[in-house]
Amino acid sequence: HFAGHGITEGGLNMGRNIVSERDMREIHCKPFQCAITEAGLKSVMNSYCSVNGEPVVGSKKMLTDILRGEMGFQGFVVSDYLSLDRLVDPFAVAENFEEAGIRAIQAGLDVEYPRSKGFSYKMKESIESGRLSMDIIDQAVRRVLTQKFELGLFENPYPDLEKLKKYLHLKSADELNEKIAAESFTLLKNENKTLPLSKKIKKIAVIGPHADNIRSLFGTFSYPAVLDMTMSREEDGQEFEEPGLIIYDVEQK
């Protein structure tokens, strides 16, 4: 999320933030700068949030002046999921999706995801009426086609599935992911030295409406959430290796 997505007021996803020019560049743009300079970053996704009152998806300052002008980014910019819609509601800086599309592409957005509601047939009407320059369209198209050409997608548009198998679901990668996840836990409070759990404990009660709901526990940006999975369980509980029987009370009885 370029940029400032992690400092929204109250920690609210898609919220707003007020940040100084120096902090934006030295803290929030810094990881992107490293990726551009050291790794040749080819694509960037805009942040959902607004920065100092301006939604990033429609901000020429963020997507063109800073990202391209100051940071030297040469790739293409894609919208976060439905972020262009937010120019209409809730940010209310565009009256309709036609206006939102014009604002976004002029700001430096090249691709709208997940569907074309702003980048639609309406753009043709905007060009004919003089509200939008064809040069802006050509610029966005050129950026995308350049990446496709450099990746060889015109000659070979389909992935080599056999080659992919060498890199997917590797045991070493799974072990590293598990290690990273385990080390990321932060214990803020441990009353009566409850943790680590004693092996003498025979039963644990997990109480609340999210007790057995993977979607709620993992958040919306995870594979289980995408599939809208929930844990299968018996009415009287579920067996685990340790510490023993776990009893779910979803209704908080």
Give the label of every model feature segment.
Residues 1-253:
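Glycoside hydrolase catalytic-domain context in secreted enzymes
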